[in-house]
Each structure stands twice: as structure tokens, then as C-alpha cells.
Amino acid sequence: MARTDLFRFLARCARTAAHCERTGMPESEAVEASRESIADRTGRRRLLQGAAGAAALAAFGAHAGKSQAQGPADVAVVGAGFAGLYAATVLAGKKLTAQVYEAGSRSGGRVASLRGVFPGQTVERGAELIDTTHSTVRQLSRQFGLTLENYEKQPGEEFFYFSGRHWSEAEVVAEYRAFVGAMNDDLQRLSGGPTADSHNAFDRELDLMPLSTYLDSRGAGPLLRRVMDTAYTIEFGREIDRQSSLALLFFAQANKRAHFAPFGNFSDERFHIVEGNDAIAGGLEGQLARAVAFGHRLVRVSRTADGRIKLAFDVGGRTVETVHAAAILTLPAPMMREIDFDASVALPAHSRTAIDGLDYGTNSKMMIGFTGRPWFERLGCNGGSYSDLPNHQNTWETAPSTAAFGVRGVITDYSGGNRGARLDPAKLQTEAGAFLQDLETVWPGTTALASRDSQGRVLAHLENWVRNPLFKGAYTNNQPGYFTGLEGHYAKPAGERLFFAGEHTDSFYNYQGFMEGALLSGARAADQAWRALR
């Protein structure tokens, strides 16, 4: 499971390298065999994951259809993203009424679909890719009658451009194969998934070691070093000197992260909702017994004398206070640091540590429209490209099922780290031009077909979540020290009848950073609130 194509590619490299080690098969043959095996697994996985999703929804008490209001709201849910909406849904299934508050003017949070900009196609400003193992997302898409398109079924190959030239997948696998051998001693000494509450001294040592230092100290080859740099920078949104080496090691050791198993049942499939991923948010919002209270920015949390939770909101410049039996806060991690937690809350040390310490990546997305699909029509590429160029890191084709050869197509330019942070939506044409110039190096002869208006302006949209005042970041980055200092803390109750949810509160070993993680964290927090109030 991964947010980006390049991370999926590394997973495939890991699996292929392991197969070469076991069998002695040449890298080029193993690469071809790996590609052929992907299609064979699709139907069986889809059936199994659909059943798993239904079971998860039933276990958390989720329901279909509009819930009925039952007097005053028992639980406040702050944030109308996936976590908050699903928490309210699960609470309704447990016969608890929730009031959802949202600082912005819409539901969905960082799941935000863009319609009407690219003719005939819906693209994603934020979360886009849905994995086979994202059972809850897929079950909800079925519940709301939405259509999943499979990006992996698109024809063509991926392009890799590093150190001034194109490379084959087999060449990357060869260097990865050598590097995996160098990691074996470290993998043997790591514990079974370290957390802030349970880890050994070696876990701590490698957790504090930046990924950049680890790659250099373990002798990563020059090509692999550049590929890893790009892959992890865009996957977690920070430069690799700001990431823990354990993020790599638990990627490589499949049994440490059961849903992300490059040597076993890792999924190479990725899906998108044709109608737009935020249609799930619309479906969940439509089921709520109480309308979402938009324009409510949480500024302070305190307790009343009888132990209830008092929330103070800024609503158009005036303060509005509400009191609830319990509260679930689902704000993005950077926004949690702006809340004033009164001493009466008695916030536990683990909660304060999580709030103060968790880091977010600086990812951006820029979508570019084309008059056709020249990456395939001219070069045989499926839309996936990766490089170490200054204005290009990773691309994929967005909404391919609604594209048309010779007519229309959309490429997503996905970035992280320093480039992701600096991209400026106010300078859209400048940013698009710089990207297209580097893309021409990766895909020669294709960028002339970028869609332009009569004045030569490129059809494009740029989203930088760091610059959005309601989010101030993309999603969780596992910085040095995260695993042994923070992992597991955010999911714990924040004192009596106060709980946290959101992708950042889910475990790294589950679905942290994904829509699935947001949904499951909402279900977990709702269950915690229900148990506290029953």
C-alpha cells in the first residue's frame, strides 16, 4: 500500500529482488514475471477485500440510511473530514447523537474533488489513490453507488529518469537486490513493531537515524540512492534527512507492517472514485441526523465542574461555547497545536507529546490537462514517471477511465519536501511551465500537447496544503524519533471523555496517512466515546 506510484514501484522491486535471491532468476525475467502476475490476482483480491470491508463496517456499527436525532447531542465531533463524518456515523449506529463542527465551508477535509476545470474529468485536489486493502473506503463507495476505476489497468510502461538518463526497472531491481542483503542484520535485530511504549535500544538507535544517513552508511548504490530519495520525499512529504530510517526498514520487512507486504501480499492495484472521492463525504454527511455546523473554528477546550467537555469556537469573530458529554477532535495535526487546552482538561502527557511532536509532510499536487494522452500515444508510457529533476519528481495519469486518446487526458505532478513546500498556486503558470520543461526531458515530444487557452495559458490546477490555513500540511511524516517517541500515543484517550481521530492518529502499522486510516480512526474514537458513556 502506498500513496505514490514510485513507492509502489519500490515495493515491486523489493518483492522481485527477494524472488531473484531465492531462485537465481535474472532481474529482467523476474520483472516480466512480476508484471504478468499482477493481473492474475485482481479478481480474488477484490472479492476477499470486499468481504473484509463489510465485516469491518458491521463490527463498528455503521449503518445505511439517515439516522434519527435523539435530543441534545451527546458527543461533539470537531472536524467534518472522513474521520469526523465516520465517527458521527458510527456513533449513530450505537444510538448516540453527535453534532459535527467544521471550521471550513464544506465537508471532506483533505479529500477534495475538483470538477469543471478539466472538461469531462473529475480530479483530486487531495487524497486520490485507494488500495485494494482499503476495505472501508471501498465498502462505502459501494454503499453510496459510486464507481471505482482501476489505474493499474492502463496500458504502457513507467519511465525512470535519474542522473541524466533513462533507466529500466531491471536496473533498479539489481541495485535494490544488493542493498536488501546489507539490511539483513538490522532487520534481525529490530523488535516486532516498536512503539513509544514498547521498543528496544536498537529500535531507538535506528529510529533516531535519518534515512539519508542510513542509506549512505549501508552502502546503497548510486541509482538506488537517488530513487529512494525521490520515493520517500514524495511518499512522506519531507526530505529524507527528516525521516526515520525505520520507515524504510518496516517497508522492507513485510511482517512488521501486515498491510504493506512487498515480499508477500502487497497490492499493486490502485483505485479512484470516478464521481470524485469526496462523494463519500457527501454520502456520510447526508446520513447525519444533525446538519454539520460549518464556520466553527475550535479555539479552546475545557471541562465543566461535572466533568463534561466545554468547547469554545470562533464563529465569524464571535465566541460560541457548547457543552457535551464527550468530544472527538479530528483536526489535522498542525491545527491541534493551535488549540488552547485549559488546565481543567488535565491533558495526559502522552497526548501533549503527540500534539507537540507529530510532523506533517509538505506535499503538493499539480494537475495538467492535455489534448489527448501523448505519454502513451507517442512513447508507450502509462503516465507514470519518476526523476531527480528540480521541477519533476513523480507523475501519474489521473481519471484515466474518462480520458480519450487524441482528445483529453490529465497528468498529476506529485511533489514533496522542499519542492512541495515552495510550489505557489498564485504563480500557477510559472510553476506549470517549469514542470513541463522538465517533463519534456522525461517524455520527449509530448509537452507540446498540453492544453492551453487562446492566450497560451496552460490548463492546470495547483494545490499546496501547507498554504491552506485550515490544514497547514499534507499528512503524517515519520520523522527521526517518531516510532519510539510518538507511535501509538495519539490513539489513546486524551483524558476522560476526550478522544482524538484523524489519519495522524492511526498507527503507522495500519493505515496512517490514508483515507482508510482516517475512517478507521473515526470508528475507533467513536467506540471509545461509546464505552466511556455507556
For the regions a language model picked out, list residue spans one by one.
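Mid-domain catalytic core of redox enzymes
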Residues: 294-414, 442
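N-terminal export signals
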Residues: 39-41, 46-67
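Dinucleotide-binding Rossmann-like beta1-alpha1 core, especially the glycine-rich loop
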Residues: 118-189
